[in-house]
Amino acid sequence: MVKVIASSVRKGNVLDVDGKLYVVLTAQNFHPGKGTPVTQVDMRRIVDGVKVSERWRTTEQVERAFVEDVNFQYLYEDGEGFHFMNPANYDQVVVSQETMGDQKAYLQEGMTCILSIHEGIPLALELPRHVTLEIVETEPVVKGQTASSSYKPAMLSNGIRTSVPPHIDAGTRVVIATEDNSYVERAKD
C-alpha cells in the first residue's frame, strides 16, 4: 500500500479504506474562498458494490492499493461479462457488468484498454481518451445560426447523445472524448 495525498486521487484509482478496497468513481477538489480545501470522492466497494462518498482535506493521506495496470484487448461480450485478452501472453479476463459501468457503450472489438488488476481480479477499466464513431441521426441546422457558438444534438452509433457543430450530418464519422461524451473533431479516416 502506498500513501498519497487526497488531492492526487483520480477516477479509477483503487483505495484501501479501513481494510476494504474501493474503486474511485469520481474525485473532485473543492477550494472554498474561506476554509480548508477538500477532496470529495465517490467510490464503489469492490467486495459488494456499495457506493460510498468520502470527503478528505486535500493534504490528508489516503492509502492507495497496489494495482497493476495492464493493456488488454477487448474481444466480445456474453452472459458472463466482457471478455478481454492480454496481447502479451494471450490470457483472457472477464470483466463484470458492474465493473464496466456505463463505459460499455464505447467498447469496440479489438480496442486496447487498460485494466487495473489487483490480485488477479479486474477492478477498473480505462478506455482510450478518444473513440471514432458514426453519427446516426442529427437535427437539421436552423438557418441563421452562427457556426462559432452553436452546436446541435446528435445520436451516435453507440446510442449516446452528444452535441456536434452544424456542418456535421448523419453518416459522418467523428472523434468523441470518452470522458464526457463531447465532440472533438471530424474523423480523418
From Swiss-Prot:
**Span of the secretion signal?**
none
Molecular function terms, GO-annotated: translation elongation factor activity
- Alphabetically ordered keywords of this record: Cytoplasm, Elongation factor, Protein biosynthesis
The UniProt entry's GO CC annotations, sorted and at most eight, read:
cytoplasm
Matches recorded under InterPro entries: Elong-fact-P_C, NA-bd_OB-fold, Rib_uL2_dom2, Transl_elong_fac_P/YeiP, Transl_elong_KOW-like, Transl_elong_P/YeiP_cen, Transl_elong_P/YeiP_CS, Transl_elongation_fac_P
Q: Where does this protein reside within or beyond the cell?
A: Cytoplasm
Q: In which pathway does it act?
A: Protein biosynthesis; polypeptide chain elongation
Q: Which Gene3D superfamilies match?
A: 2.30.30.30, Nucleic acid-binding proteins (2.40.50.140)
Record keyword Nucleotidyltransferase present: no
Task: Read off the CDD domains from this record.
Answer: S1_EF-P_repeat_1, S1_EF-P_repeat_2
> Is Protein biosynthesis among the key words of this record?
yes
User: What domain of life is recorded for the organism?
Assistant: Bacteria
Q: Name one GO biological process term.
A: peptide biosynthetic process
Q: What is its main location?
A: cytoplasm
NCBIfam families, alphabetized: efp (TIGR00038), PRK00529.1 (NF001810)
Q: Which family does it belong to?
A: Belongs to the elongation factor P family.
HAMAP family, A to Z = EF_P
Functional description taken from the UniProt entry: Involved in peptide bond synthesis. Stimulates efficient translation and peptide-bond synthesis on native or reconstituted 70S ribosomes in vitro. Probably functions indirectly by altering the affinity of the ribosome for aminoacyl-tRNA, thus increasing their reactivity as acceptors for peptidyl transferase.
Q: What is this protein called?
A: Elongation factor P
Q: What is the species listed in this Swiss-Prot or TrEMBL entry?
A: Rhizobium etli (strain CIAT 652)
